[in-house]
Amino acid sequence: MTKESSVLNHKASGTALVICAPSGTGKTTLIQRLRKEFPCFAYSISCTTRPPRKNEEDGKDYYFISQEEFIARKNEKYFAEWAYVHGYFYGTPLAPILTILNNGQDILFDIDVQGAAQLYLTLPYAKYIFLLPPTMVELEKRLRSRGTDREDIIQHRLLSATQEIRQAHWFDTWIVNENIDKAYDELRATYLASKLSPKFQPTLITSILEGW
């Protein structure tokens, strides 16, 4: 889909920030800090077929639905993107995204690489950010330090991380999370800079020249 054929109203579009990262990179921590500093962010709530984790709430963290319901919605073109990850389906509803952006509000997406590639077809002008570990050795160390996953799951996550990193070449921005504070400063700066882009200020020039 081209920018010209997008379903969004370019006269009043918020900033869309898409953040992807392999498991263990620190994405959740960085996103939480960004949302705390910028509470104006709308957050894209995904649907998933996986069971809720401890302290997760339906309608707040995810919409937890059955596989049958997910497939039915997918066939109805309900999702802007969807993916099958680690044995479960994940998908981002399209309608709320369009409403949020057309109202001029900023929105944050926390999705995987498969989903980001699909979302690009609908939102090519979003800012796509990929978070990287400093090394694969460090990523393995972080995954093991959690103490929650079996060895086979750790190995699967490392394999997935390798595949995801190899697909990161098309993203707009890479941020290496070696130091959490430095990585956050870079993420914050990327967000603020994206708001200055002409593609998110389509009426600025017209308003400046109006009446001249």
Curated annotation (Swiss-Prot):
InterPro entries with a match to the protein in the record: GK/Ca_channel_bsu, Guanylate_kin-like_dom, Guanylate_kinase, Guanylate_kinase_CS, P-loop_NTPase
EC number: 2.7.4.8
Family matches, as Gene3D superfamilies: Guanylate Kinase phosphate binding domain, P-loop containing nucleotide triphosphate hydrolases
Gene Ontology CC: one annotated term: cytosol
Segments forming domain Guanylate kinase-like: 14-192
Predominant location category: cytoplasm
Catalysed reaction, written as an equation: GMP + ATP = GDP + ADP
Keywords tagged on the record: ATP-binding, Cytoplasm, Kinase, Nucleotide-binding, Transferase
Name this protein carries in UniProt: Guanylate kinase
Protein source organism: Lawsonia intracellularis (strain PHE/MN1-00)
Lineage: Bacteria, Pseudomonadati, Thermodesulfobacteriota, Desulfovibrionia, Desulfovibrionales
Gene name tied to this protein: gmk
